Amino acid sequence: MKEEKSEKESKLKKRILQIIGTITVVCVLMITAGCGIMGMGSKSWIEKQVSDIEKVYPTENPEDLFEKFPIGFTIYQSRIIEENGKTYSIRLEMKGNKDIKKIEGEVKKVLLESKPYKETIVKESKVEYIKDKGLVLENPELVNELLPKNYFLFQKLKLNKDILKKLEVKEKGFSFETGRYNIKYLITNEEIDNYLGLNKEKVSFDINGEYSEIDKTYFHTIIIGKNTEIDFSEKVVEEEIDKENEE
């Protein structure tokens, strides 16, 4: 009797495993089919997501961003530099305040150490964008160290879907879990050369973003680097409506 009961339990377990296996296969097929239908993660799908980058690139007068993003925005920049055998990050963060129509923030020079990893702020200053003057430091004596350029790259760099389609794609990626996507191009561009002090060099040019069916706020980061190194990044983020309502 015990052997018969054990045999029945064994058959039942096998049957359950078969059912689970069948369900798993069906789910995988459904997900694969769904991805094929939607094209999520494909080159054309990602390029469609980043096509609204022309909303910012170019914006010759940063104050025009208040018309594009009425509830405000934040601009981030990061630039990696080498000085006297040491590595520094120049980090700029400025907020577009919709109430006073000013773009203000801070810029810092941060020493990066690897063993152990450590960040030390060595220089910093408040900074403001002023029309016809560009980026202006509260501490002007630090301009050479903190502001390699007194304007944003998006003021000069023109990007749109037609331009991007002509570029060589190096790689692309999409996460179904987070909705984040990126596409990396190879590019030689005069405005990038001028901004980063390059000489007609081909560099990698990443565009990162995040897909959401609900949240359609503007969110793109561009990352420029030589080989695998990240030399510069710039991000413009539209303020979210929910945050505005909470305030």
Predicted segments, located by residue:
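Sec-dependent N-terminal signal peptides of Gram-positive bacterial secreted proteins and lipoproteins
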Residues: 2-4, 12-40
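N-terminal leader/targeting segments and the immediate start of mature chains
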Residues: 30-80
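Generic short beta-strand segments
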Residues: 75-82, 110, 184-192
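Flexible, membrane-facing loop/turn or short amphipathic-helix motifs
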Residues: 80-85, 115-118, 190-200, 230-231
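An acidic-aromatic
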Residues: 93-148
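Flexible, processing/modification-adjacent segments and terminal tails
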Residues: 125-177
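Extended beta-strand-rich segments in extracellular/periplasmic secretory proteins, especially
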Residues: 159-211
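Acidic, serine/threonine-rich low-complexity disordered tracts
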Residues: 201-247
